């Protein structure tokens, strides 16, 4: 697959072009210079051929954080098959822009000068001043008004020689259409059953925590490279940044989400970032909650952790900056258990992202938690445990009426979801459900994994009584989410 990188100084419209081409609002855009800080990747289609597009941070001479952003952007340009260097058509050509452009020219790869914000012919006349760059290919566009983009796409198609790939793709598609499929229904179903589900092959891991607890450093340590920009400046990550790696043959995708601040400090582009954080977690299997061991936990840590039951994710708690811990292990764990009783089922790991302490252990733990997250209990074993639980602690009656559990079945995984079939579904107290879940945790290794337990009626009358109170899994109420955390 061919790769295209969009480079240029801050605030020239790189992220807007990125969003326009991929037809999604994936990169956060703003009038604030330097909004994009990490390289974002997405695929889009040009005349039937898929290409990868990279949205990079602005290139400038700033030091510190933005020097790292510039370095990452230039590196992305070196790895791409085509570079679109973007400038602002409303601004006269700048010497540093020319210098950056000519530096990229030395790489001897296809390079296009894209002049953005050319909203009308008057601006286009002025924009001819950019001929001083010495670009072989120069295109005038306006992302905001969707002007000149079709011509730019045609140029990209030719520069990347995509016609050959399009021809190959069309020939393959035609060949497949002409083949006779003589498999029986049974054979076809057999193929489906033996084919692994791609969504289950790839493990999606979200990394959450408040600002500056070391999430980006942790992501870089896991990947073994600087994928996410790290800085002492609080709130460096704005867009969720994702990347993939193999861990013992399993494909794992990490998402480093925006650091979460107090609500009173959330404004502008950070509001969009928080919405995107929730969206990223909605597609994750496991969440790593990063806490700062160099200082006491705060109320905001607890509020952030409330995102976890909402999405019913596998959980790993990471006490980062352990090399600077403010208390001894026993005291910190005691404080953790006091503040986060609803995470009692989660493994807690101490590590230092900066020096690499326990990073390999964390990788192994991710695989273990996912295995539990995807585990299906054999029905016979499940019912044996339920029978033992009932025998050990009888179900309380409902005002003298006997409550029975007939049987149990696990109807879904990711996370484990179990239904109990009862004669009186509404009479099974939440404390008894918690007891059942604790028994399941005791008998089966479900560390780090939520267990969702529901109770259903045995006959139509029971189902009718419960259906009115039942809600869609995607709209779990705050009350139910809270109860699930404690069971």
Swiss-Prot record:
Residues 375-459 form the KH-like domain. GTP 1 binds at residues 8-15, 55-59, 116-119. GO terms for molecular function: GTP binding; ribosome binding. The keyword GTP-binding applies. PANTHER family: GTPASE DER (PTHR43834:SF6). Keywords: GTP-binding, Nucleotide-binding, Repeat, Ribosome biogenesis. GTP 2 binds at residues 209-216, 256-260, 320-323. It comes from the Bacteria. GTPase that plays an essential role in the late steps of ribosome biogenesis. This is GTPase Der. Residues 459-487 are annotated as: Disordered. Gene3D superfamilies: 3.30.300.20, P-loop containing nucleotide triphosphate hydrolases. Belongs to the TRAFAC class TrmE-Era-EngA-EngB-Septin-like GTPase superfamily. EngA (Der) GTPase family. CDD domains: EngA1, EngA2. NCBIfam families: GTPase_EngA, small_GTP. Pfam families: KH_dom-like, MMR_HSR1. InterPro entries: G_ENGA, GTP-bd, GTPase_Der, KH_dom-like, KH_dom-like_a/b, P-loop_NTPase, Small_GTP-bd. Associates with the 50S ribosomal subunit. HAMAP family: GTPase_Der. One of its GO terms (biological process) is ribosome biogenesis. Residues 459-480 have a biased composition (Basic and acidic residues).
């Amino acid at each position: 697959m061919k790769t295209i990188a969009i480079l240029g100084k801050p605030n020239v419209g790189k992220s807007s072009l990125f969003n326009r081409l991929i037809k999604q609002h994936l990169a956060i855009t703003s009038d604030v210079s330097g909004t994009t800080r990490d390289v974002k990747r997405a695929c889009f289609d040009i005349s039937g051929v898929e290409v990868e597009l990279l949205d990079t941070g602005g290139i400038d001479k700033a030091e510190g954080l933005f020097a790292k952003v510039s370095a990452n952007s230039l590196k992305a340009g070196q790895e791409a098959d085509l570079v679109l260097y973007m400038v602002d058509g409303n601004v006269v050509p700048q010497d540093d822009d020319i210098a950056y452009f000519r530096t990229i020219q030395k790489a001897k790869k296809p390079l296009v000068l894209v002049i953005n914000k050319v909203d009308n012919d008057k601006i286009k006349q002025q924009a001819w001043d950019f001929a001083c760059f010495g670009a072989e290919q120069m295109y005038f566009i306006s992302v905001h008004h969707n002007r000149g983009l079709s011509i730019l796409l045609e140029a990209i198609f030719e520069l990347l020689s995509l016609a050959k790939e399009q021809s190959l793709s069309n020939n393959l598609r035609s060949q497949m259409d002409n083949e006779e499929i003589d498999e029986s229904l049974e054979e076809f179903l057999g193929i489906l059953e033996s084919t692994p589900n791609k969504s289950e092959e790839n493990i999606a891991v979200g990394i959450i925590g408040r600002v500056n607890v070391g999430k980006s450093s942790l992501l870089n340590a896991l990947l073994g490279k600087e994928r996410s920009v790290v800085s002492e400046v609080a709130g460096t990550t704005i867009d969720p940044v994702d990347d993939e790696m193999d861990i013992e043959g399993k494909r794992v995708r990490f998402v480093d989400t925006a650091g979460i601040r107090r609500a009173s400090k959330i404004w502008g582009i950070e509001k969009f970032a928080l919405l995107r954080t929730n969206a990223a977690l909605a597609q994750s299997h496991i969440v790593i909650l990063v806490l700062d061991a160099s200082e006491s936990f705060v109320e905001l840590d607890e509020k952030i952790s409330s995102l976890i039951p909402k999405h019913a994710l596998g959980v790993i708690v990471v006490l980062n900056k352990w090399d600077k811990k403010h208390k001894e292990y026993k005291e910190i764990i005691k404080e953790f258990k006091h503040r986060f009783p609803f995470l009692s089922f989660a493994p807690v790991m101490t590590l230092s992202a900066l020096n690499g302490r326990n990073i390999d252990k964390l990788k192994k733990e991710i695989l273990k938690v996912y295995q539990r997250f995807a585990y299906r209990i054999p029905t016979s074993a499940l019912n044996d445990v339920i029978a033992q639980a009932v025998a050990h602690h009888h179900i309380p009656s409902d005002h003298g009426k006997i409550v029975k559990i007939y049987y149990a079945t696990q109807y879904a995984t990711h996370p484990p979801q179990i239904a109990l079939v009862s004669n009186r579904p509404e009479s099974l107290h939440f404390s008894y459900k918690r007891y059942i879940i604790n028994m399941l945790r005791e008998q089966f290794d479900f560390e780090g994994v939520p267990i969702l337990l529901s109770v259903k009626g045995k006959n139509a009358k029971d189902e009718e009584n419960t259906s009115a109170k039942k809600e869609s899994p995607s709209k779990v109420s705050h009350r139910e989410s809270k109860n699930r955390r404690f069971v």
